[in-house]
Amino acid sequence: MSPYSAFIYNILTMGLIFPWTYLWAPGALPGGRLVWGILLAMIFEIPIALAYVWLSTALPRSGGDYVFQSRVFGGGIGFSIVMSGFVIWILQWVALSGWLLSYLGFASLFLGLGGTMGNPTLTSIGVWFTTPWGIIIVSILNALLAMLLLVSGFKNYVKFQYVMWYATLLSFGLMLYLFFSATPETFAQKLNDFVVASGGAPNFYETAINAAKGANIDLNPPFSLLATLLVAPIAWTSLQWASYSAQQNGEIKGARSFQNQLVIILGSLIVTGLLLAALAAAFEHAIGTNFLYVAGAGYWAGLAEGKFNGVFLWPNILAMALAGSPIIVVIISLGYILNAFQIVNNCYIGMTRVMVAMSLDRLLPEWVSRVSDRLHTPVNAHLAYFLASIPVILVYNLWGQWTALTLGVTFACGYVFIVTALAGALMPYRAKALYGASPGAAYKVGSIPMVTIFGLIGALVGGVMVLMFMFYSALGLTSVLAYQVGSASWRCRSFGISWPE
């Protein structure tokens, strides 16, 4: 994998298609500003990203967070933190990637074709992809295809990643164009036409606006600084993954280069943050502030009139309504389909590398790290992770309470990022030889290593982000179930420390 491939890998991993911020934030946080919240999340992630740059150049090995933490804090801590927060919880991302593929990919494709071609049958097919078993079938096939691709050789994934990258960029660019070239007035008419062509009732836009007002939803709330600050943790669900390429550092050419890692990690963060903020600005420009809160109410408050055929009004659906063209629908959908497929691939790539590193340190069974003589890939690790994902996919789609914890993965993975940032801060003191031989050792502020400064700031910022999820109900993780899951994760962590090194 070249540095450029790693750079686009991180952008795809952060997910240009991730939709939650655009509906969750206006629904749960009236008065918050989407664009500023996303930009704040990007700024807050910078010190964490920089800590990963220093760690990656000091330890350019596959295994990422586990390697960083275990070499600074010891194998027991590294194993328990990364196993509980990453290896186990990223199984949730396997389920999420299937949801993204089925709901935002295939469902949007057929809903869009139904609306632009005036074919209610296609619309009905699209609705099926939003049902639990529709999503389950797509999710398992998605995970299986990713496993087969990766087992065939990492180079095959890298080649296909370029297809996913350019398709996603084209899709994203088209959406920006459609939104920036529209006005709320033209949007209202085109949305109404789109819904009628799909077999729906006329005047969808006006009906939704009136229903929101009838439900006492403020469609033009005053600016709220607190709400804007709370948008940042939602956007962080995407931007926190800027450093994910570190899991396969050993397979990135020039991974020890400080400049390369700055581009791969920090560069991908800034590009993704700016693109997501641009989409937020374009989205609100096209549909208007009033309808933004209607769409948010459909997602957060369950406003029935704020949905289209029971489907939330995601940016890609509304872009298709604006386009009115089956060709544009296919192009936008293809980007979403391929970026969703990339998500499950990165789950396997990152976690199999972590599992192999743990196995080589004798913290997982030896068979986990066996590499196929013919395929030159860790087949056993891939197969184990695929099988482990199936029950998670089933629970995610069949148990509504678990679905409510969709982004609980942000909390669990968040504490991994915090501990890794601390590992960066303490590396000059607890792993002196490693740090002294690294390119980053030359950068100091006075006598204080810069990685210590960035690592401490990053750990503090990450801690604040995680605590916001725990204490603000608008972020969705204050239920009894959420605390039970968090407690179980902590018990798993504590159990892991007792494993022999």
Language-model region placement:
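TM-loop-TM module centered on a large, flexible mid-protein loop between adjacent transmembrane helices
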Residues: 67-74, 111-112, 199-218, 264-344, ...
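Hydrophobic transmembrane alpha-helices that form the core helical bundles
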Residues: 26, 46-54, 58-143, 148, ...
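A generic transmembrane alpha-helix motif of multi-pass inner-membrane proteins
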Residues: 36, 168-171, 175-177, 182-183, ...
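Hydrophobic, membrane-embedded alpha-helices of multi-pass small-molecule transporters
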Residues: 2-21, 138-145, 199-286, 326-348, ...
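Membrane-interface "cap" regions at the ends of multi-pass membrane proteins
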Residues: 1-35, 45-50, 194-200, 500-501
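C-terminal membrane-solvent junction of multi-pass transporters and transport-like membrane proteins
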Residues: 131-134, 163, 371-376, 417-474, ...
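Loop-to-transmembrane helix boundary motifs in multi-pass membrane proteins
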Residues: 1, 133-137, 252-274, 356-398, ...
